[in-house]
Swiss-Prot record:
Motif ('KMSKS' region): 289-293
Lineage, uppermost ranks: Bacteria, Bacillati, Actinomycetota, Actinomycetes, Nakamurellales
Species in which this protein is naturally found: Nakamurella multipartita (strain ATCC 700099 / DSM 44233 / CIP 104796 / JCM 9543 / NBRC 105858 / Y-104)
Keyword Cell membrane: no
Required cofactor(s): Zn(2+)
GO biological process, one term: cysteinyl-tRNA aminoacylation
MF-aspect GO terms: ATP binding; cysteine-glucosaminylinositol ligase activity; cysteine-tRNA ligase activity; zinc ion binding
Domain of life, source organism: Bacteria
Subunit structure comment from the entry: Monomer.
Name used for this protein in its record: L-cysteine:1D-myo-inositol 2-amino-2-deoxy-alpha-D-glucopyranoside ligase
Length: 405
């Protein structure tokens, strides 16, 4: 599937810093240690609605990772999926009286436009679950053959499930206890109480065909895949059995990333699936997480239509630390617009060199993407009328992705 155009990323003098990131699996900020080609998989959208600021904040966080690796001299192989077949998409299409494929294509196109406006570097591989269907069905059959998957004894709908005991370390990525995992499974699309499952936490691999639902042929019979196996297969087949970073929002820690890691590790025989599991915090509005189910969404496209500068949006979302849950408000946007204006005025100045400011940007981002510290240093630069603007503007463009000139 086509992604979106890449923004230009200027080169900046000096040497990039090695990046340290928080790893959900260890609870520690650890160095990333990629080889010449750094590899990253970030879970993409389920395209049944427009991109909201919660989505945008996640993709901006991993865009910073991408930019820091480039600055440190790595090539980056970035893969992102699109969950273009899933229950929420089908439900929304039925509600609106449109085909699920037409709805998905429309929202994917809008997402591309939003990412372009926000100057997010695109993935090298942008893969829909539907286009990877043959790969996914082969992987499900492989898990069945290995004894890691089974059918529930349901005469009408003998769906295929993954046996979580097959991984030998289920739970290591999230570090949640069983009660928490069961609660989150029930809240986030799982079915822990379905009869016939070996373990309550066993996730769905293949849903056999239901009336009035799209389905695909497979060795297991017609049906469609579960969510987690799609990401395991798309990442593994394009990057390899071990990746440097798996990323997404903090709501994906469990069950999605736990289960996709377990699938990938059983399929490849190698562990861990990712050297870092890194997660972005949630964006809230009026005291609640911004989500489609709550209907409290601020859409990127709507703000763009209102004439909001996408660089102000980007700067507003980067004002808080990426791992923190944080609130969006009119005040956040107003502050970001004022800051952007100050920085743009400073970027046009001539004066004494500001190499120390460029180094402060690198140092702050290298320390678990500490954007608040970076922004503080840039505010001080903007306030000092003796400092030159050109080198700092290039660094802000290259590393923060905010265009000042």
């Amino acid at each position: 599937m086509q992604s979106w155009p890449s923004p230009p990323v200027p080169g900046i003098p000096g040497t990039g810093r090695p990046l340290r990131l928080y790893d959900s699996a260890t609870g520690e900020v650890r160095p990333t240690d990629p080889g010449p080609v750094a590899t990253m998989y970030v879970c993409g959208i389920t395209p049944y609605d427009a991109t909201h600021l919660g989505h945008a904040a996640t993709y901006l966080a991993f865009d910073l990772v991408h930019r820091m690796w480039l600055d440190a001299g790595h090539q980056v192989h970035y893969v992102q999926n699109i969950t273009d077949i899933d229950d929420p998409l089908l439900e929304r299409a039925q509600r609106d009286g449109v085909s699920w494929r037409k709805l998905a294509d429309r929202e994917i196109g809008l997402f591309r436009d939003d990412m372009t406006a926000l100057r997010v570097i695109p993935p090298a591989d942008y893969i829909g679950a539907v286009e990877a269907m043959d790969e996914v069905t082969a992987a499900v059959q492989e898990l069945i053959d290995a004894g890691a998957a089974y059918r529930v004894p349901d005469e009408q709908y003998p769906d295929v499930y993954f046996d979580v005991t097959a991984s030998g370390q289920f739970g290591y990525e999230s570090r949640y206890d069983e009660a928490t995992m069961l609660r989150l499974s029930a809240e986030r699309g799982g079915d822990p109480d379905r009869p016939g499952k070996r373990q309550r936490l066993d996730p769905l691999l293949w849903r056999v065909e239901r009336p009035q639902e799209p389905s695909w042929s497979s060795p297991m019979g017609p049906g469609r895949p579960g969510w987690h196996i799609e990401c395991a297969v798309i990442a593994g087949n394009r990057i390899g059995p071990v990746i440097d970073l798996q990323g997404g929002g903090s709501d994906l820690i469990f069950p999605h990333h736990e289960c996709s890691a377990a699938h990938a590790e059983v399929l490849s025989g190698k562990r861990p699936f990712a050297r870092h599991y890194t997660h972005a915090g949630m964006i809230g509005l009026d005291g609640e997480k911004m989500s489609k189910s709550r209907g409290n969404l601020v859409f990127v496209s709507r703000l763009l239509h209102q004439g909001v500068d996408p660089m102000a949006m980007r700067l507003g979302l980067l004002a808080g630390h990426y791992r923190q849950d944080r609130a969006w408000s009119d005040e956040v946007l107003t502050a970001a617009e004022a800051r952007l204006a100050r920085w743009r005025a400073a970027a046009a100045r001539t004066g004494v060199d500001a190499d120390s400011v460029v180094q402060a940007i690198r140092d702050g981002l290298a320390d678990d993407l500490d954007t608040p510290t970076v922004i503080e240093a840039l505010d001080a630069w903007a306030a000092d009328e003796t400092l030159d603007g050109s080198a700092v503007a290039a660094a802000v463009d290259a590393l923060l992705g905010v265009r000042l000139v």
